[in-house]
A protein has these predicted regions:
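Basic, alpha-helical nucleic-acid-binding regions used in initiation and control of genome expression
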Residues: 44, 48, 65
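Propeptides and adjacent flexible N-terminal/non-core segments of secreted
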Residues: 1-42
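Secreted/processed peptides and extracellular or luminal domains of membrane proteins
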Residues: 39, 48, 83-85
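Short, compact, well-ordered microdomains
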Residues: 60-89
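Surface-exposed polar/charged interaction patches
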Residues: 26-33, 55, 59, 73
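Folded, disulfide-stabilized extracellular/luminal domains of secretory-pathway proteins
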Residues: 50-53
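Residue-level detector of bioactive/disordered segments in secreted/extracellular proteins
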Residues: 35, 44, 79-81
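Generic detection of long, well-ordered alpha-helical segments
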Residues: 39-43, 56, 60
């Protein structure tokens, strides 16, 4: 199911992609990590990342390629995707 403001995306989602900002906004927002509060939610896995990518129209191979790339950049869980992939040191 596509998010109401999303367009279908083919291939993996990477930093610099036109949909990257929407992805990070959703991952950091109340439907996922919820960084807009005093604490945040992270289960130590990529459950929110995977769900949001699917809702944005990525198929399973594209999600797998995206998450493999995120792990290669230090994004082994949802919050690390934001800290390490979106804002590398």
């Amino acid at each position: 199911m596509l998010h109401k403001n999303a367009t279908a995306t083919r291939g993996p989602l990477m930093p610099g992609d036109p949909s990257w900002g929407e992805f990070i906004e959703r991952l950091a927002g109340p439907e996922a990590c919820n960084f807009h509060t005093d604490g945040w939610t992270c289960f130590g896995d990529l459950r929110f990342t995977t769900r949001i990518l699917g809702e944005m129209g990525l198929d399973e191979p594209s999600i797998d390629a995206s998450t493999a790339s995120f792990k290669g950049r230090g994004g082994y869980c949802d919050c690390e995707v934001i800290f390490n992939v979106d804002h590398p040191t």
